[in-house]
Curated annotation (Swiss-Prot):
PANTHER family: RIBOSOMAL PROTEIN S19P FAMILY MEMBER, SMALL RIBOSOMAL SUBUNIT PROTEIN US19M
Entry keyword annotation includes RNA-binding: yes
Taxonomic placement: Eukaryota, Viridiplantae, Streptophyta, Embryophyta, Tracheophyta
Entry's Gene Ontology cellular component terms: chloroplast; mitochondrial small ribosomal subunit
PROSITE patterns in the cross-refs: RIBOSOMAL_S19
Gene coding for it: rps19
Its biological purpose: Protein S19 forms a complex with S13 that binds strongly to the 16S ribosomal RNA.
Subcellular location(s) per record: Plastid, Chloroplast
Protein name as catalogued: Small ribosomal subunit protein uS19c
Length: 92
């Protein structure tokens, strides 16, 4: 179920403060965040945000096509290594 249109998109307050501070200074630096649930809003476009994936922070450059999506969608948490090879010893 999607979020109600009456409510605004969720963005963590500390992340919003960091972005507003960088926009007023007109500087570009990497913003580190653990807030994977935050929605990407238009003022974030052009910034690089390092999103935590459970192990490390992955730097993601925000473009205009990402607006409306969540930050966590761009930092995968699982590393699929493939299925086990057909091992006949395990089937006996």
């Amino acid at each position: 179920m999607t979020r109600s249109l009456k409510k605004n998109p969720f963005v963590a307050n500390n992340l919003l403060k960091k972005i507003n501070k960088l926009n007023t200074k007109e500087e570009k630096e990497i913003i580190i965040t653990w807030s994977r649930a935050s929605t990407i809003i238009p003022i974030m476009v052009g910034h690089t945000i390092a999103i935590h994936n459970g192990k490390e922070h992955l730097p993601i450059y925000i473009t205009d096509r990402m607006v409306g999506h969540k930050l966590g969608e761009f930092a995968p948490t699982l590393n699929f290594r493939g299925h086990a090879k057909s091992d006949n010893r395990s089937r006996r």
